[in-house]
């Protein structure tokens, strides 16, 4: 109980941003026109993870250089280096470069094309 069960990514243009996440992370997106909502299926239900949705951003995002004022999620990836390369090739920017979390793994943060911060996590007990 009290564990995350759904997430939402706010987007200026949900249709465009959903394509970025589908292309970079392989997510399946289903548009629900009656709600102007985009359901996100992040993968099969056999492993850890949750699904979510894209919602139209109401108003402007945070000012450039402002601290994050959000609930930031990290995505489990096979390779932080590969995920960062694929994301930046698709229009993301590096928010914080790859860093070791000793004995746990590697972490990096990107800023998607609509300025949302997303963590990328690669498990690696040998990370130093």
Q: What does each model-found stretch correspond to?
A:
Residues 44-48, 60-61, 79-81:
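Short, charged/polar surface micro-motifs in flexible loops or helix N-caps
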Residues 1-18, 70-75, 122-128:
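N-terminal beta-strand motif that seeds the catalytic metal site of vicinal oxygen chelate
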Residues 64-93:
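Mid-chain, well-packed structural core segment of small domains
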Residues 9, 30, 84-128:
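Vicinal oxygen chelate
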Residues 1, 8-49:
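Core segments of cupin and vicinal oxygen chelate
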Residues 49-56:
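A short, structured beta-strand/loop element
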Residues 37, 74, 107-109:
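Short hydrophobic/aromatic beta-strand element in the GNAT-like acyltransferase core
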């Amino acid at each position: 109980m009290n564990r995350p069960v759904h997430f939402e990514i706010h987007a200026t243009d949900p249709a465009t941003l959903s394509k970025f996440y589908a292309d970079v992370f392989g997510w399946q997106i289903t548009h629900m026109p009656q709600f102007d909502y985009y359901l996100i299926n992040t993968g099969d239900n056999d492993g850890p993870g949750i699904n979510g949705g894209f919602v139209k951003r109401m108003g402007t995002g945070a000012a450039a250089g402002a601290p994050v004022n959000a609930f930031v999620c990290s995505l489990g990836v096979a390779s932080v280096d590969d995920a960062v390369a694929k994301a930046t090739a698709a229009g993301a920017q590096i928010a914080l470069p790859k860093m070791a979390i000793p004995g746990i793994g590697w972490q990096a943060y990107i800023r998607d094309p609509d300025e949302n911060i997303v963590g990328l996590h690669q498990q690696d007990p040998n990370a130093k």
